[in-house]
Design a protein with these regions (language model features):
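N-terminal auxiliary segments of SAM/dcSAM-dependent transferases
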Residues: 1-21
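S-adenosylmethionine/decaboxylated-SAM
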Residues: 4, 39, 43-221
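S-adenosyl-L-methionine
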Residues: 18-33, 39
Length: 221
Protein backbone atom coordinates (compact mmCIF):
# COMPACT_ATOMS: atom_id res chain seq x y z
CA UNK A 1 0.00 0.00 0.00
CA UNK A 2 1.19 3.52 -0.80
CA UNK A 3 -0.13 7.06 -1.04
CA UNK A 4 -1.29 6.53 -4.62
CA UNK A 5 -3.57 3.74 -3.39
CA UNK A 6 -4.87 5.91 -0.53
CA UNK A 7 -5.71 8.66 -3.01
CA UNK A 8 -7.41 6.24 -5.41
CA UNK A 9 -9.58 4.85 -2.60
CA UNK A 10 -10.59 8.34 -1.52
CA UNK A 11 -11.50 9.23 -5.10
CA UNK A 12 -13.53 6.02 -5.46
CA UNK A 13 -15.65 6.72 -2.38
CA UNK A 14 -16.02 10.40 -3.29
CA UNK A 15 -17.45 9.38 -6.66
CA UNK A 16 -19.67 6.57 -5.33
CA UNK A 17 -20.97 8.10 -2.11
CA UNK A 18 -20.70 11.87 -2.36
CA UNK A 19 -20.56 13.11 -5.94
CA UNK A 20 -20.05 16.60 -7.27
CA UNK A 21 -20.98 19.59 -5.13
CA UNK A 22 -20.74 23.02 -6.80
CA UNK A 23 -20.79 25.02 -3.55
CA UNK A 24 -18.01 23.03 -1.95
CA UNK A 25 -15.96 22.93 -5.14
CA UNK A 26 -16.37 26.70 -5.46
CA UNK A 27 -15.18 27.15 -1.88
CA UNK A 28 -12.04 25.14 -2.59
CA UNK A 29 -11.36 27.03 -5.81
CA UNK A 30 -11.85 30.42 -4.15
CA UNK A 31 -9.59 29.44 -1.26
CA UNK A 32 -6.85 28.32 -3.64
CA UNK A 33 -7.17 31.49 -5.74
CA UNK A 34 -6.82 33.57 -2.57
CA UNK A 35 -3.60 31.78 -1.65
CA UNK A 36 -4.92 29.84 1.33
CA UNK A 37 -3.03 26.64 2.18
CA UNK A 38 -4.71 23.41 1.08
CA UNK A 39 -4.93 21.95 4.57
CA UNK A 40 -8.70 21.60 4.88
CA UNK A 41 -10.31 18.22 5.55
CA UNK A 42 -10.79 15.88 2.60
CA UNK A 43 -14.14 15.40 0.87
CA UNK A 44 -14.80 12.12 2.69
CA UNK A 45 -13.76 13.65 6.01
CA UNK A 46 -16.07 16.60 5.40
CA UNK A 47 -18.96 14.21 4.82
CA UNK A 48 -18.02 12.42 8.05
CA UNK A 49 -18.27 15.70 9.97
CA UNK A 50 -21.65 16.35 8.38
CA UNK A 51 -22.93 12.91 9.39
CA UNK A 52 -21.60 13.27 12.95
CA UNK A 53 -23.36 16.61 13.32
CA UNK A 54 -26.55 15.24 11.77
CA UNK A 55 -26.56 12.06 13.87
CA UNK A 56 -25.98 14.00 17.09
CA UNK A 57 -28.86 16.34 16.32
CA UNK A 58 -26.59 19.33 16.80
CA UNK A 59 -28.30 22.72 16.91
CA UNK A 60 -25.23 24.70 17.95
CA UNK A 61 -21.75 23.98 16.59
CA UNK A 62 -18.41 25.55 17.50
CA UNK A 63 -15.48 25.35 15.10
CA UNK A 64 -11.94 26.38 16.03
CA UNK A 65 -10.00 27.00 12.82
CA UNK A 66 -12.06 28.25 9.87
CA UNK A 67 -9.47 28.52 7.07
CA UNK A 68 -11.59 29.00 3.90
CA UNK A 69 -14.73 27.56 5.46
CA UNK A 70 -14.77 24.19 3.71
CA UNK A 71 -15.40 22.12 6.85
CA UNK A 72 -17.67 24.90 8.12
CA UNK A 73 -19.98 24.46 5.14
CA UNK A 74 -20.18 20.71 5.70
CA UNK A 75 -21.05 21.22 9.37
CA UNK A 76 -23.51 24.08 8.81
CA UNK A 77 -25.47 21.99 6.33
CA UNK A 78 -26.28 19.55 9.13
CA UNK A 79 -27.93 22.24 11.25
CA UNK A 80 -31.69 22.79 11.41
CA UNK A 81 -33.04 26.02 9.93
CA UNK A 82 -32.74 27.79 13.30
CA UNK A 83 -29.32 26.32 14.12
CA UNK A 84 -26.10 28.29 14.53
CA UNK A 85 -22.43 27.66 13.88
CA UNK A 86 -19.76 29.82 15.50
CA UNK A 87 -16.36 29.58 13.84
CA UNK A 88 -13.06 31.06 15.06
CA UNK A 89 -10.26 32.14 12.70
CA UNK A 90 -6.97 33.85 13.50
CA UNK A 91 -6.26 35.35 10.07
CA UNK A 92 -8.54 38.13 8.79
CA UNK A 93 -7.75 37.25 5.16
CA UNK A 94 -8.86 33.66 5.69
CA UNK A 95 -12.02 34.84 7.42
CA UNK A 96 -12.87 37.18 4.52
CA UNK A 97 -12.50 34.35 2.01
CA UNK A 98 -14.62 32.09 4.21
CA UNK A 99 -17.40 34.65 4.51
CA UNK A 100 -17.67 34.88 0.73
CA UNK A 101 -17.75 31.09 0.51
CA UNK A 102 -20.58 30.99 3.05
CA UNK A 103 -22.59 33.51 1.03
CA UNK A 104 -22.18 31.51 -2.16
CA UNK A 105 -23.24 28.36 -0.30
CA UNK A 106 -26.36 30.11 1.02
CA UNK A 107 -25.32 29.57 4.64
CA UNK A 108 -24.16 33.01 5.78
CA UNK A 109 -27.13 33.51 8.10
CA UNK A 110 -26.32 30.36 10.06
CA UNK A 111 -22.62 31.10 10.51
CA UNK A 112 -20.98 33.60 12.86
CA UNK A 113 -17.28 34.27 12.22
CA UNK A 114 -14.98 35.56 14.97
CA UNK A 115 -11.53 36.83 13.96
CA UNK A 116 -8.55 36.82 16.32
CA UNK A 117 -6.66 34.47 18.65
CA UNK A 118 -8.99 31.59 19.46
CA UNK A 119 -8.14 31.47 23.15
CA UNK A 120 -9.18 35.11 23.53
CA UNK A 121 -12.43 34.52 21.67
CA UNK A 122 -13.16 31.41 23.71
CA UNK A 123 -12.63 33.44 26.87
CA UNK A 124 -15.14 36.04 25.69
CA UNK A 125 -17.68 33.35 24.82
CA UNK A 126 -17.37 31.96 28.36
CA UNK A 127 -17.77 35.44 29.84
CA UNK A 128 -20.88 35.99 27.73
CA UNK A 129 -22.32 32.71 29.01
CA UNK A 130 -23.41 31.69 25.53
CA UNK A 131 -25.69 28.69 25.14
CA UNK A 132 -23.73 25.41 25.18
CA UNK A 133 -22.56 23.82 21.96
CA UNK A 134 -23.66 20.35 20.91
CA UNK A 135 -20.62 19.67 18.73
CA UNK A 136 -17.14 21.20 18.64
CA UNK A 137 -14.70 20.70 15.76
CA UNK A 138 -11.09 21.71 16.41
CA UNK A 139 -8.72 22.06 13.47
CA UNK A 140 -6.21 24.63 14.68
CA UNK A 141 -2.65 24.96 15.97
CA UNK A 142 -1.78 21.85 17.92
CA UNK A 143 0.50 23.31 20.63
CA UNK A 144 -2.62 24.99 22.05
CA UNK A 145 -4.86 21.97 21.56
CA UNK A 146 -5.15 21.02 25.27
CA UNK A 147 -6.36 24.54 26.07
CA UNK A 148 -8.80 24.50 23.16
CA UNK A 149 -10.33 21.24 24.33
CA UNK A 150 -10.60 22.41 27.94
CA UNK A 151 -12.37 25.54 26.73
CA UNK A 152 -14.61 23.43 24.52
CA UNK A 153 -15.67 21.36 27.52
CA UNK A 154 -16.56 24.52 29.44
CA UNK A 155 -18.70 25.63 26.49
CA UNK A 156 -20.42 22.26 26.10
CA UNK A 157 -22.93 20.15 28.02
CA UNK A 158 -23.39 16.45 28.82
CA UNK A 159 -23.73 14.62 25.53
CA UNK A 160 -21.74 17.13 23.49
CA UNK A 161 -19.21 15.73 21.02
CA UNK A 162 -15.71 17.18 20.56
CA UNK A 163 -13.77 16.26 17.40
CA UNK A 164 -10.07 17.10 17.01
CA UNK A 165 -8.33 16.79 13.63
CA UNK A 166 -4.68 15.96 12.84
CA UNK A 167 -3.83 14.04 16.00
CA UNK A 168 -1.64 11.32 14.44
CA UNK A 169 0.56 13.60 12.35
CA UNK A 170 2.13 10.92 10.21
CA UNK A 171 3.04 8.92 13.31
CA UNK A 172 4.88 11.81 14.98
CA UNK A 173 2.60 11.34 17.99
CA UNK A 174 4.77 8.39 19.07
CA UNK A 175 8.14 9.74 17.91
CA UNK A 176 10.94 9.65 20.52
CA UNK A 177 11.38 13.41 20.14
CA UNK A 178 8.00 14.81 19.05
CA UNK A 179 7.72 18.31 17.61
CA UNK A 180 5.63 21.05 19.21
CA UNK A 181 2.44 19.96 17.44
CA UNK A 182 2.78 16.30 18.41
CA UNK A 183 3.70 17.35 21.94
CA UNK A 184 0.46 19.33 22.16
CA UNK A 185 -1.56 16.30 21.11
CA UNK A 186 0.30 14.10 23.60
CA UNK A 187 -0.43 16.56 26.39
CA UNK A 188 -4.09 16.42 25.43
CA UNK A 189 -4.09 12.61 25.49
CA UNK A 190 -2.41 12.58 28.90
CA UNK A 191 -4.96 15.03 30.25
CA UNK A 192 -7.85 13.01 28.85
CA UNK A 193 -6.45 9.85 30.42
CA UNK A 194 -7.08 11.32 33.86
CA UNK A 195 -10.56 12.63 33.10
CA UNK A 196 -13.86 11.05 34.08
CA UNK A 197 -15.83 13.92 32.55
CA UNK A 198 -14.99 12.81 29.01
CA UNK A 199 -14.96 9.50 27.16
CA UNK A 200 -12.52 9.59 24.23
CA UNK A 201 -10.96 7.57 21.45
CA UNK A 202 -8.70 8.23 18.45
CA UNK A 203 -8.92 6.89 14.91
CA UNK A 204 -6.03 6.73 12.44
CA UNK A 205 -6.81 7.73 8.85
CA UNK A 206 -5.10 7.50 5.47
CA UNK A 207 -6.20 9.12 2.24
CA UNK A 208 -5.74 12.22 0.13
CA UNK A 209 -4.55 14.09 3.22
CA UNK A 210 -1.88 11.51 4.01
CA UNK A 211 -1.52 9.61 7.28
CA UNK A 212 -3.25 11.29 10.20
CA UNK A 213 -6.31 10.85 12.39
CA UNK A 214 -9.13 12.21 14.54
CA UNK A 215 -9.71 12.26 18.28
CA UNK A 216 -13.32 12.13 19.42
CA UNK A 217 -14.49 12.86 22.95
CA UNK A 218 -17.98 12.87 24.44
CA UNK A 219 -18.77 15.06 27.42
CA UNK A 220 -20.18 12.70 30.03
CA UNK A 221 -21.03 15.10 32.83
Amino acid sequence: MNEDTWLAVDEYFEEQLIGEDPALESALAASAAAGLPSIQVSVCQGKLLYLLALASGAQRILEIGTLGGYSTIWLARALPADGQLVTLELESHHAAVARQNFKRAGLAERIEVHVGPALETLGRLREQRVAPFDLVFIDADKPNIPRYVKSAVELSKPGSLIVVDNVVRGGAIVAPEPDASATGVRQLASWLAGQTQLSATAIQTVGSKGYDGFLLARVQS
